[in-house]
Amino acid sequence: MHVTAMTRSIFFRWVPVALVVAVTSGCPNPMAVKDDVDSQFFYIRPGSQLILHQDVSIPSGRSHTSFQHGQVVSGLDNYAVGCVLDVRDLGPGSVTAATFTIKRAESSTEWISRPNIMKFYRVMYLQSESQPGVLRLTCQDWDGPLMGEDISVSEMREALGGIFSFVFAP
């Protein structure tokens, strides 16, 4: 059987196109995961809100308070997601129930003990007219570099319990 030049031309022109269409047609939009609140890649947009539902104390000599499994804790179990609310001034003090605007949010990693342990964290920089000393909320956990994942909203909600809630900007 003899393949003509025209058949070869059609084959080499349309087969790559067909392969690209076949491969990409089943793939979801990669930007959709940034809009899915259940995705670990969810993008917290500026203008979102973090609502503190109860007053929390800042211990003496510290500039933060910690939350894990829906409770205020004195220290974090680093291998479970926990969050730290940072303030400008050393305690004793308190942060009163309020709504904070999230000015910027980012996710990142940093080495704790190379090559075995990394810190995976998400930080939200906060703003409040009534409490300008409240700086940020950082949610984090430690894991192996190949096993760890970005901190998801559902993990943050579990760590914060009913103490905080989120309202995400569209």
Locate predicted features.
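Bacterial N-terminal signal peptides that target proteins for export
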Residues: V3-V15
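Envelope-exposed proteins and targeting segments
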Residues: P46-S48, T96-A98, I117-M124, G133
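C-terminal motif of bacterial Sec signal peptides marking the signal peptidase cleavage site
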Residues: V23-G26
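C-terminal partner/receptor-binding element of secreted or periplasmic proteins
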Residues: S130-P170
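Hydrophobic helical h-region of N-terminal Sec-dependent signal peptides
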Residues: P16-V21
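Short, conserved beta-turn/loop elements at beta-strand boundaries and strand-helix junctions
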Residues: K103-S113
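N-terminal secretory signal peptides
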Residues: P28-R104
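Short beta-strand and adjacent turn/loop elements
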Residues: H53, V123, Q127-E129
